Amino acid sequence: MKNVYLAQMSLEIPGSNYYYFPYSIGVVWAYATTQPGINENYQLCNIFSVKEPIDQLLEKIIDPDVLGLSTYTWNTMYNEELARRVKERYPQCQIIIGGANTPNLSNGYFKTRPYVDYLTHQEGESSFTGLLQHFIGERELMDVAGVSINDAGKTVTTGPSKRIELDDVPSPYLM
């Protein structure tokens, strides 16, 4: 089984202990588990949602094959540092960044972030799942829509992803 770690770090509100369930990244995983090849080949080891010192978080990430990061304005810099440190420690780990703050025009992105392997654009459910299927040889990479690929620092982008039907996405609360 391949180890998957996901993170959608919370917005920090000074003086509060408010945390939330990382719904968006939970939906991405919930959708993935409905698709061929995922449950037989991958296990979700953890979903992180609380920003803590990266050294502490790294102790909880053991032998990752895939790290998926949902990025927003408030966690972009943290996610990029986490991605860099995970790639440094586990060079074989595939780093995937998606979410609302992922650049749609990603030319030059990988030159300054060589530790990121893939970006997902628009709705990440099918793109993330397609990448997981690619990693186990069940799908050609260029057939995975909505992805930018780090090709030795150059950006290769596949076609746009199609919108998915909300009825096809299970609730992460009910898994």
Residue ranges and their predicted role:
Residues 7-9, 152, 160-161, 172-174:
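Generic beta-structure capping elements
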